[in-house]
Amino acid sequence: MTLSGEQEIPRRTSRLILLSVCIGQTIVGLDQRAITVALPTLTATFHTSFTTIQWTILIYDLVLIGLIITMGRLGDLFGRRRLYSLGFLIFVIGSAVGGLSQTPGQLIFFRAVQALGGSMIAANGRAIVSVNLPPQDRGRALGLTSTAFHIGFLIGPALGGFLIDSIGWRWIFYINMPFSLCGAYLAWKIIPETRTNEKIAVDVPGALLLFLTNGLFIYAIDQLPRVGWHHPRFLLTLSLSVIALLFLLRVEAKTKTPILTLSMFRSRLFSAGIASLFLIAGTLSAINFLLPFFLQNLLGYSPSQVGWIIVADSVIIMIMAPIAGSLSDRFGSRLLCTTGCAIVAVAQFFLATLDLNASLLRIMLPLIVWGVGWALFNAPNQSSILGAVSPEKIGAAAGMIATTARTGGAMGVALSATLFGYLLAAAGLSGSQIESPESWRTAPETFMGAFATTIFVLNFFTLIAVLFSAVRGEKPQA
């Protein structure tokens, strides 16, 4: 492997490299969360349904799921600086034209463009730090990049709400542009080019099949409330998703550098950890999708107020994550993960029992408890998954963690939106009534009932995650 980063790099240059990567990580984290607060506003602006507007989130996740590992390997082959800088520029283009969108279709397409750039940034940023910084600084630097992502993830809802209330929803896209251009400039001017001379096979068929499997399944679920179980469109799309999945499993079993290393699932510790992560990520993403609609359209909070409310769990997670890691070292992952999942289930139960007169404290408490549960689950679960595989497979296991979390999140959003829409339609509301924020206020009990029922159903999946965590064991299974 030939690395220009093997030469001694001045400390000032190292700091600027780290700054560029931290900018990228912050933007990726911020962009994921800022749009959640805008969902009710976007639904009203475009006079569309929340089942349509959910695709602004789903398309972003689907593109990242399909491309992030591939972009990392392309960076190894063609140069990490090149792909990282290009990622910033593509992200700028997606942000600029996304803010100009006049239809939901345009917005969804430009979110996909953002995700294309985001996959290049996310896949190559930490590799650039690892290659270019000296070993004695590497751990701290990687910790800072992780902190940068979580800072963006934390401030995203509050910043997004403030921008929507003050200057309009389009600025949640425009705000990315100056920072992305700064990151691109630093990347191109400061970061040395690094690549490998080794031959690396890129699993393009696997990436494409993974995208098709998830995309077709989510599209089938999205169509279900409108066309029904027996409609040819639903049956055809679902069948194509299953066929794509079968081809994916076949391809991944044979390729030398698969996106999904299926042999790792022979470990009960690994497979139970992945299964519980998929379920918990799905329920949490689903609630993050539904909660802004509940708070804005039913309880009358402004976007900026909603942004500050849903930040609560992220603050708790940042505080609790180091504590959870220490507790995991002392008590083991099974106890911490099972307890964390159970706490999440309790928090979701109390969210489902909220009513139209719920006070701010009554809303915040379940979110705080939810953050505690997620923190107790997440770090120990990741540690146990990585500990269940041999050292040479740790990179593949880390990729599987990221892919699972995003796939679970996308599935959770799709299923919750479908169920919520189905319950409203079953209550006699037409599509135009469901789309209108005024209808939420004229028939609040109907929407409140659908919200509560959807959360209760999601909680069923959380309880299954509790069971997976409880049976995982503590040591890798041979």
Predicted regions and their residues:
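Flexible cytoplasmic inter-helical loops of multi-pass small-molecule transporters
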Residues: P192-L208, T255-L260, A478
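Intrinsic disorder in cytosolic terminal tails and internal cytosolic loops
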Residues: M1-T13, P437-T442, A470-A478
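C-terminal membrane-cytosol helix-exit motif in multi-pass small-molecule transporters
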Residues: M177-R195, F211-Q223, L240-K254, A465-G473
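A residue-level signal for alpha-helical anchor/packing sites in multi-pass solute transporters
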Residues: I128, N132, F162, L186, ...
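Transmembrane-helix bundle of Major Facilitator Superfamily
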Residues: T2-K189, M320-A324, F331-L335, T339-A345, ...
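Short, membrane-exposed interhelical loops at transmembrane-helix boundaries
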Residues: S432-M448
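12-transmembrane solute porter fold
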Residues: R15-L30, I35-V37, F50, P205, ...
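A gly/Pro-rich, aromatic-decorated transmembrane alpha-helix motif that marks the paired
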Residues: T147, I151-I167, Y219, T407-L429
